[in-house]
Amino acid sequence: KEYTLDSSNLVICDGVKPVAIAGVMGGLNSEIRDNTSEVMFECAKFARDNVRKTSRALGLISDASSRYSKGVDEYATVMAIDRALHLIEELGCGKVSSTRVDANTGNSVEPREMKVSTAKVNGVLGIEVPTEEIIRILTNLNFAPVVNGDELTLQIPAYREDMESYPD
């Protein structure tokens, strides 16, 4: 299927033509087939709002667009590609080139912190959850809660760009 794109749609190109709609869907010319002998791995972070708008405008929902729309931890992309390349070599699935390109734009997400009281958490939930349980849940979600009386200080994981205030 063909899609009409506009200047707000981010695409990935091979130097000549588009090969994917960034964060949404790869094109036919990027598929792996039985006769594929070379593969390029890409791990990227795209602006979640742009991916969400493009996906909706084109009516194109994919696993990729769902993930990118929620925000991606840019640091996890490096770990993910390193792990994938390690497994390819370790399992004998292919030979990894020594060429690696890092096109970091420098738009890193600054570490963020949020303070919230357990009373506010319970108010949002509409039920009384013991502080120990709140701490356990937030720890499992990688928020590294620090308790100071009734107040919790949370370290917001970089991949949770959707977290802007305590109800989130």
Give the role of each language-model region.
Residues 1-168:
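RNA/tRNA-interacting regions in translation and RNA-turnover enzymes
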